[in-house]
């Protein structure tokens, strides 16, 4: 397979390029009978779409979704759900020079070497524009999981460049363009981005994503562990260079006496595992963190070569996000939802008739707090 499909029983296949006429996804495996409208999907697309603040690309895409199939009289039919998002604000003239050149940090060289041809306009298939249909398809998963299990997803930015953003108040996340849970730091974040843009530079970010009310038992050891598939999906997001589950790399400096999450009849005492044990969900919150690299498209000149290997200087033109992490929160939520949906259906297929005398352990002890 050519890597355009995620999942085994709930699958999402995306198509399109950044400056093509449209982008989209086909979601297959959704159980029949769930109410679904374009308005349901639009809510999350609006959280991700470009041009919503001065700190992101000024490309103005409405990202209006069209449901082409798989829904009849407002209900899913159990057949493939095709979703289409038309591109309306392409400026392909900004990319005329890069057909013969390779932009440092971009996929240009790798795509050209692999395929022998590439669409240079806006990065073509490698553009973060292709995360829009992923977000759209994930609404199907989010809605079904919430109705079936009460599963909830949320994410937030915990670091912008060098600036750490301590978690303060979840109600603030949707009130600012950074998805930051700390209203006090918004002026500082805005100043930081303004200075970065004036310098013609970019920065990275760290995004946290959580899932609550996750059923226990999801995951297929050894090679389709739940956390392995989560990491696989998160690395499929543009510009992601690192993934942590639970304590992640902090596990290196922890002692076993600290890292192991104690089990009590009234709940887990901590969640260093991030919601999985042995690759199977424990019923605790899933805790995932992703590291996003600085945007490669910057105004500052950088050295590169052209198709013939001749040295050149590349200075990127066009409309770009100085930090792609600013719009990454709904994308990370989407990937987590897609993986969970797939594993729920896989678990039902294999273990629906399994009965156990074990009582489920609550996700956390009363009074404990895990963001």
Curated annotation (Swiss-Prot):
It is an enzyme of class 4 (lyase). Reduced FMN (FMNH(2)). GO terms for molecular function: chorismate synthase activity; FMN binding. FMN binds at residues 125-127, 238-239, 278, 293-297, 319. Residues 260-280 are annotated as: Disordered. Its cofactor is FMNH2. InterPro entries: Chorismate_synth, Chorismate_synth_AroC_sf, Chorismate_synthase_CS. GO terms for cellular component: cytosol. Disulfide bonds: none annotated. Pathway: Metabolic intermediate biosynthesis; chorismate biosynthesis; chorismate from D-erythrose 4-phosphate and phosphoenolpyruvate: step 7/7. One of its GO terms (biological process) is aromatic amino acid family biosynthetic process. Its EC number is 4.2.3.5. NADP(+) binds at residues 48, 54. It comes from the Bacteria. SUPFAM superfamilies: Chorismate synthase, AroC. It catalyses: 5-O-(1-carboxyvinyl)-3-phosphoshikimate = chorismate + phosphate. Keywords: Amino-acid biosynthesis, Aromatic amino acid biosynthesis, FAD, Flavoprotein, FMN, Lyase, NADP. NCBIfam families: aroC (TIGR00033), PRK05382.1 (NF003793). PANTHER family: CHORISMATE SYNTHASE. Homotetramer. Belongs to the chorismate synthase family. This reaction introduces a second double bond into the aromatic ring system. This is Chorismate synthase. It comes from Polynucleobacter necessarius subsp. necessarius (strain STIR1).
């Amino acid at each position: 397979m050519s890597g355009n499909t995620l999942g085994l029983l709930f699958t999402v296949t995306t198509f399109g390029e950044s400056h093509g006429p449209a982008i989209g996804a086909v979601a297959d495996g959704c159980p029949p009978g769930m109410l679904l409208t374009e308005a349901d999907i639009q809510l999350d697309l609006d959280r991700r779409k470009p041009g919503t603040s001065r700190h992101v690309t000024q490309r103005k895409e409405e990202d209006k979704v069209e449901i082409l199939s798989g829904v009849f009289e407002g209900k899913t039919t159990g057949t493939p759900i095709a979703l289409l998002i038309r591109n309306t604000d392409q400026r392909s003239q900004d990319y005329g020079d890069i057909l013969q050149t390779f932009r440092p940090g971009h996929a240009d060289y790798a795509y050209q070497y692999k395929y022998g041809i590439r669409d240079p306009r806006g990065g073509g298939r490698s553009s973060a524009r292709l995360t829009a249909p992923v977000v759209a398809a994930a609404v199907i998963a989010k809605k079904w999981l919430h109705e079936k299990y009460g599963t909830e997803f949320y994410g937030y930015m915990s670091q912008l460049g060098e600036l750490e953003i301590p978690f303060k108040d979840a109600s603030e996340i949707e009130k600012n363009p950074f998805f930051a849970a700390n209203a006090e730091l918004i002026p500082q974040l805005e100043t930081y981005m303004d200075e970065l843009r004036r310098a013609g530079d970019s920065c990275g970010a760290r995004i946290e994503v959580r899932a609550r009310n996750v059923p226990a038992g999801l995951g297929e050891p050894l090679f389709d562990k739940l956390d392995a598939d989560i990491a696989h999906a998160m690395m499929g997001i543009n510009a992601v260079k690192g993934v942590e589950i639970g304590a992640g790399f902090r596990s290196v400096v922890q002692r076993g006496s600290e890292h192991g999450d104690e089990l009590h009849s009234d709940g887990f005492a901590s969640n260093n595992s991030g919601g999985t044990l042995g690759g199977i969900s424990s019923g605790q919150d899933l805790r995932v963190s992703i590291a996003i690299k600085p945007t490669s498209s910057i105004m500052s000149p950088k050295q590169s070569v052209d198709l013939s290997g001749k040295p050149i200087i590349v200075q990127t033109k066009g409309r770009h996000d100085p930090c792609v992490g600013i719009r990454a929160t709904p994308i990370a939520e989407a990937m987590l939802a897609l993986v969970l949906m797939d594993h729920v259906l896989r678990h039902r297929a294999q273990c629906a008739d399994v009965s156990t005398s074990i009582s489920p352990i609550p996700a956390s002890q009363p009074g404990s707090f895990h963001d």
